[in-house]
């Protein structure tokens, strides 16, 4: 059996051209990075979703750059064959293109092989600036979690006509802007599948969907949702296992054995 090759940024474009679909999943530490890499995932996203999944926040806004550097470094230590993408958190690129470059350098030094940021037209200058220092950028349009307050929550985008933020025509403009600014790929989140498919057909870079139907060049999900560790019931989430229930059962058994004195037994004790 041939050893799996390291995934690189140019691979994403080649796979789009050949029709090979791209799998991306989140990980925030070395242990889970190794697990998803062994499963054969193409891209590991060190997402600012860590704020909700691990830290217990109701949205991603509180996550800061230092935290993303920490988690990116942990994932990078796993030495995965999968491409490692680091999320630029809210407040780390909005102030200026210079800030965006400096934040991207910090994530790259931590081990990110590509950075991701949210937005379209209004972040095109930041994307262009980051790519000028040879750091690959992945865009993210549609339901952008860092725009939680403007959207009034995590709401599907692109259902209305017009050119205002979140409208169908604006999302098409956002996709073009991200591509023209030099992004190597773009995540499309929380939009009608027909629109995501149209965007995929009209842009020349890979699209990776989440809650955007099956017409994108790839898909991304949060690992904790895939494993059934979360209790998310979002329409676009699929639990491929029920590790939450399994984990509760295992810990309960441990608690019971401690309380009865059954643990540790002779086989797990030194003489």
Where are the predicted features?
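Alpha/beta enzyme core
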Residues: 2-271
């Amino acid at each position: 059996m041939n050893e799996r090759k390291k995934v690189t940024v140019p691979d994403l474009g080649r796979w789009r051209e050949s029709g090979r679909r791209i799998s991306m999943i989140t990980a925030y530490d070395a242990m889970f990075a190794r697990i998803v890499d062994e499963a054969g995932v193409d891209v590991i996203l060190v997402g600012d979703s860590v704020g909700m999944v691990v830290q217990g926040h109701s949205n991603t806004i509180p996550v800061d750059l230092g935290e993303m550097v920490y988690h990116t470094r942990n994932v990078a230590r796993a030495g995965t064959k999968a491409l490692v993408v680091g999320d630029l958190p809210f407040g780390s690129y909005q102030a200026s293109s210079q800030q965006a470059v400096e934040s991207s350098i910090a994530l790259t030094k931590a081990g990110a092989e590509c950075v991701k940021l949210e937005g379209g037209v209004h972040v095109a200058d930041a994307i262009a600036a980051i790519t000028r220092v040879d750091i690959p950028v992945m865009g993210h349009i549609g339901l952008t979690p860092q725009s939680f307050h403007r959207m009034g929550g995590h709401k599907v985008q692109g259902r209305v006509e017009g050119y205002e933020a979140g409208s169908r025509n604006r999302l098409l403009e956002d996709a073009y802007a991200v591509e023209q600014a030099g992004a190597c790929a773009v995540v499309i989140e929380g939009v009608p599948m027909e629109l995501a498919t149209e965007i995929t057909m009209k842009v020349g870079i890979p699209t990776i969907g989440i809650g955007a139907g099956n017409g994108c060049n790839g898909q991304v999900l949060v690992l904790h949702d895939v494993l059934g560790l979360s209790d998310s019931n979002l329409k676009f989430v699929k639990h491929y296992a029920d590790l939450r229930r399994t984990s509760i059962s295992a810990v309960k058994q441990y608690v019971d054995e401690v309380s009865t004195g059954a643990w540790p037994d002779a086989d797990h004790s030194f003489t």
